[in-house]
Amino acid sequence: MPKANIYYFVEDIQFKLPNPKIITDWIHNVIQQENCQLVNLNFIFCSDNFLHKKNLKYLQHDTLTDVITFSYAEDQKNIEGEIYISIERVSDNATTYQIDFWQELYTVMIHGVLHLLGYNDETLLEQEEMRKKESIYMLANRIVNLH
């Protein structure tokens, strides 16, 4: 069976993802390592304002956020969804945490993918597991210094 596609879109900002083929292969690899299959995945890179409106409309949260993930999958083994990422939040977070912008972006991207794979981050224990998985997939796939 051929690989399902991952699509990248931009809303309300100017942004270009470097090396989309490498990123796509990386995400496919992560999904396979989790014993799941990709059906369809859209990344939407956007502004704070665009994502804030989504946050209000769909989650009733009146806050800025770096990522919102929507799963459309019928089961947890078949991954289908959208991941919205605020480039402005990623940039601010990178400055706050004193890390490279691209490292923060790729971490946020894999964070969204992990949500689609069934990982949560509501409790401290879940957050620890999520961070551990993020680190494993960032390092194992040498994604940290990609740009």
From Swiss-Prot:
Record bears the keyword Hydrolase? yes
Which enzyme type, at the first EC level?
A: hydrolase
The record's annotation in InterPro entries points to: MetalPrtase_cat_dom_sf_prd, YbeY, YbeY_CS
- Quote the PROSITE patterns the UniProt record gives: UPF0054 (PS01306)
Please, which domain of life does this record's source organism belong to? Bacteria
Keywords recorded for this protein, A-Z: Cytoplasm, Endonuclease, Hydrolase, Metal-binding, Nuclease, Ribosome biogenesis, rRNA processing, Zinc
Where can this protein be found? Cytoplasm
Gene Ontology MF: a single term: RNA endonuclease activity
Cofactors (names): Zn(2+)
EC annotation from Swiss-Prot or TrEMBL: 3.1.-.-
Q: Read off the Pfam families from this record.
A: YbeY
Family annotation (NCBIfam families): rRNA maturation RNase YbeY
Family classification: Belongs to the endoribonuclease YbeY family.
The protein in question is named Endoribonuclease YbeY
Q: Which organism is it from?
A: Amoebophilus asiaticus (strain 5a2)
Q: Which gene encodes it?
A: ybeY
